[in-house]
Amino acid sequence: MKILDGKAVSLKVKESVKVRADELKKFGVEPTLAVVLVGEDKASQTYVRAKEKACNEYGIKSVAHRLSENTTQNELLALINVLNLDDSIHGILVQLPLPKHIDTNVVLAAIDPRKDVDGFHAVNVGKLVSGLDGFVPCTPLGVMEILKEYGIEVAGLNAVVIGRSNIVGKPMANLLLNASATVTVTHSKTKNLKEICKNADLIVAAIGKPFFLKADMVKDGAVVVDVGINRLDDGRLVGDVDFDEVAPKCSYITPVPGGVGPMTIAMLLNNTILAAQAKIAKN
């Protein structure tokens, strides 16, 4: 059993980001990410600070817009419009979740697809489904980067994705399909989940339920990727996979923490660099 070390892979990606950011600056372009945070959600504030810190460390300028909880949808859309038109901004990220009075789909649709570094705009979703180049959500993209870094050939594998969210499950399935895996997506209504998982060469768990994937659901030699991040009552951070039970059966497995988590921000930085490079190419 080998550990898939997402922290190490993320550092490699971020070092590459820094090199390319320095190259862009030679052309007079400072790669810039605008981060929009609405409200006082503690987890969101933590994520935004982590994104700002990573940007500053690896050569990307971050511009934060912190808006109050009672910001109206129209006020938020007006800000996004300003950022869309600002040539110095290459990437726009609206931190989710948004307050309940704001329609997330309307807000995401307002972002210029060329600046949609989170990969949530319908144009980029459509490109992913069609196998075309576009921005891809950072977490599933990070999973693919880990698999690539460890030389795990996805083509021809039976892959099971547990979870069908727009942020992880669906894009993960499409990335694996585009890489020629045979993909099954499972969810809360799936029957015979245990049997389906037992046939999988590769399992990606992304449902947000601690210790959901047990050893009796995994065949010997499978690759298991744990996207879950769950905080237990005792303060421990654990994944969707019962690591101690499942790991001995795996050929490769990601830990939590230190697996997929660090890749999300690394791929966000990478997407921001791609947006800045595309801008130069266009000009």
Swiss-Prot record:
One of its GO terms (cellular component) is cytosol. Keywords: Amino-acid biosynthesis, Histidine biosynthesis, Hydrolase, Methionine biosynthesis, Multifunctional enzyme, NADP, One-carbon metabolism, Oxidoreductase, Purine biosynthesis. The keyword Hydrolase applies. Its EC number is 1.5.1.5, 3.5.4.9. It holds the Pfam family THF_DHG_CYH. Pathway: One-carbon metabolism; tetrahydrofolate interconversion. It comes from the Bacteria. This is Bifunctional protein FolD. NCBIfam families: PRK10792.1, PRK14186.1, PRK14191.1. Homodimer. It catalyses: (6R)-5,10-methylene-5,6,7,8-tetrahydrofolate + NADP(+) = (6R)-5,10-methenyltetrahydrofolate + NADPH; (6R)-5,10-methenyltetrahydrofolate + H2O = (6R)-10-formyltetrahydrofolate + H(+). NADP(+) binds at residues 163-165, 188, 229.
